[in-house]
Amino acid sequence: MITEREYHPVLVKAQSFSDLTNHDTPDDGRYITGVVRIPQVSTQELVHDTYRYVIIHGCRSSLRGGHYCAYVEVLDTHPIHGMDINSIHDWVREYVPVHGCLSFADDLDVEDGDKPIAYCIGWDYQSSRYRDSFMNNIENNIMDDICGATEWLEMVAKRQQFTCPTCDQHTDKIHT
């Protein structure tokens, strides 16, 4: 079960692992859903009480390794809401314990106006060690979809196009 004390990103529902292991094939619409924790920052102290929903797409290889993209919900009550993109990138790199690099795009202009701002995050796994750790995390944390995630995930999954800022090989239509 997900607990309040968990800190590392936790993936909770898998539809397909194939896109994560076959980096030479463009994303074909299959995805893995789950949640990721983004800790809040109050002065220098971390308050680990914020879960956010995420969609991870297996994509083509980037020059730096296997590449994944994710949408993360950022509520307006969270400290990073509305921050400069570069500041967010630096903050996440320092405080969020994930393997690989993180890059933020501008908010994705979510169509439903009452939904929180969403950011696109790219994971660049640079070695088999990171990839294996990532897959192990997925395989050991598969759970039923959590309450409240489905509607948001379905809304984001309907988006037809976006440009991934972290991989030059992508085009606007890689992710469908």
Task: List each language-model region with its residue ranges.
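Cys/His-rich microdomains that often coordinate metals
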Residues: 171-172
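Polybasic, proline/glycine-rich intrinsically disordered low-complexity segments
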Residues: 41-46, 51, 79-161
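Charged, compositionally biased non-catalytic regions
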Residues: 1-35
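Amphipathic, interaction-prone secondary-structure segments
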Residues: 30-91
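Cys/His-coordinated zinc-binding microdomains
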Residues: 168
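The −1 position to Zn-ligating cysteines in a subset of zinc-ribbon hairpins
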Residues: 163, 176
